[in-house]
Amino acid sequence: GNVTPNLARSWETPDKGKTWIFNLGQDIFWQDGEKLTSDSINYQFSDVEVDKPDEHTIVFKLQEQFSVFPSIVSRPTFKKGLLGTGEWKVTNISLGQAEFVQKLILVNTKKDKQIYKFYPTEEQAKLAFKLGEVDEIQGIYNIKPFDIWSTVTITEEVNKNRVVVIFLNTQDKLLSDKSFRQALTYAIDKNSGGQRAISPISPNSWAYNPTVKTYDQDLERAREFIDELPNELKENLSINLVTTPVLLSLAEKISKEWESAGIETHVQVSSSIPYEFQTFLAIFDIPTDPDQYAIWHSTQTSTNISKYQNPRIDKLLEDGRVELDLEERRKIYLDFQRFLIEDSPAIFLYHPVTYTVIRN
């Protein structure tokens, strides 16, 4: 999606994306009654110079051109005490171990109260609902056992801002071979989850490319790619698939499909991104802006999950984050998706369905 005005009514860049000037609204107040001014907004950027020439203007001076910057500063803004500018005010916050937020209490101007509780896993949230600790749970992926309860109302939504994806370790001896990566991709039935995904960019985005290669399931094609592998790779063809607990059943299904193509598969469960892996099945949060430099650029060693290195992709990502013209940016990201999908450093499966369960 596009960045839209909120606290800032308008913004501009006089030098092609190196300096960004934001003009704040003049009729906005914090929840304590204080007027919102440039001095009451603080961003902690280590490599950005911030000037506030008057109470309605903030100027950010970057070290390099960066067309994505408006989306970076579009996150929710609070002042000290978790005070915002909206209808609902945080009146209490409870923290657990490692500063994990356990509970928020919010009150609006009519004195209505909402209590939000947070759980580290989906299973713990579902248990809390069963025990009557909460009356509504949001954003769960596995609706069981509530689908057979008569005392609840269930709604579902396809979350197009997330994608279920298998990251392939392109530095692995076996997975460095493009033909093998494509064999894995062709072997999977990708229509058994939510809405079919073909790209790391959301279909809601202005940069989405609907014409990329789709890799519909084709076991015969997968076996052909495997037959073409060098003999030393075909010997004892075996692979590990790591996944998170919520996707375990999907991982087991994929394991059977890979084995049908002649690839012995071992499934492991991990609660975090493993440092060493061959294939990793996870749910990926798609950034609002199509810039995915952190995920696919070869220099991003801590966030490039597939350990992917491709000079053409690097150049497209570099160009996309400095280009200001929207149509030119769109062309760049259309090419980015086309070449990335062709090279198969990851397998995009579907946009997941999430459920909300409300006690009647």
Residue map of PLM features:
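Ligand-binding "clamshell"
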Residues: 146-157, 279, 290-304, 360
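Append "and occasionally in soluble cytosolic enzymes with long acidic Gly/Pro-rich linkers
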Residues: 176-256, 260, 268, 335
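N-terminal lobe/hinge region of extracytoplasmic solute-binding protein
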Residues: 1-15
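Gly/Pro-rich hinge or "lid" segments in bacterial periplasmic/extracellular proteins
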Residues: 2, 55, 61-116, 122-124
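Extracytoplasmic/peripheral linker and loop segments enriched in polar/acidic and small residues
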Residues: 266-271, 294-359
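A bilobed periplasmic-binding-protein/Venus flytrap-type ligand-binding module shared by bacterial periplasmic
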Residues: 105-108, 152-183, 187, 207-212, ...
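Extracellular/periplasmic solute-recognition and catalytic clefts
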Residues: 93-105, 115-171, 279, 283-284
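Short helix-initiation/N-cap motifs at beta->coil->alpha
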Residues: 116-127, 245-246, 267-275
